[in-house]
């Protein structure tokens, strides 16, 4: 029997993960699929559809992967960790220190794990490896306004006519203003200098046809890491997110080296 995966969200990423689980030659199997609008699950057999996440333990999942919205971690994260390992892709939920502490404590008490997915972060392992040695870390995103969710911010994307810095400051602040866009920034902060010290910049540029992520890190010993990655976008997600998430799932199953 393969590792049982529960998937929350049946959009661009969720659909791709379901397909990969189904094509994994028995290495993985589906425990359940949940979507806020259950009508979207018309192509999923009813026995795999889970309407009420409060009943998640009945599906006996080994790993639950959230690929929908940070509110699922806020509302159900502790419930999930009481019965399974949990991997939230909407990492911005973990910018809440109190919530993160509760999730970590729940995992400790129940022998489960809270996984931090790699997401679109390039160089995350190098950042984690050096730990407290980083003196300064900065992460910059450049995206077309159409690929940024401005609903929690003060900006009207229709008024952005050229390259515009829509946020510059600590990662903790941007996580609240752009919760669907900056999961990788939160991951970067959590594995390096922390949510208040790690610097974030979000630049909206109508001239872009891709998303660009830049990470810069300066160590106390004078060493420097600089990475830059560009990728096509689908909605607010980069197209590489599917491969990255699948790799994180394989690692969580023990099939690949790494965390």
Per-region residue spans from a language model:
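Rossmann-fold NAD(P)-binding glycine/threonine-rich loop
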Residues: 91-112
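NAD(P)-binding Rossmann-fold cofactor-contacting core
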Residues: 24-44
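General beta-strand structural signal in soluble alpha/beta enzymes
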Residues: 66, 88, 114-118
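Active-site regions of enzymes building and remodeling cell-envelope glycoconjugates
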Residues: 44-53
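Glycine-rich adenosine-cofactor-binding loop
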Residues: 4-17
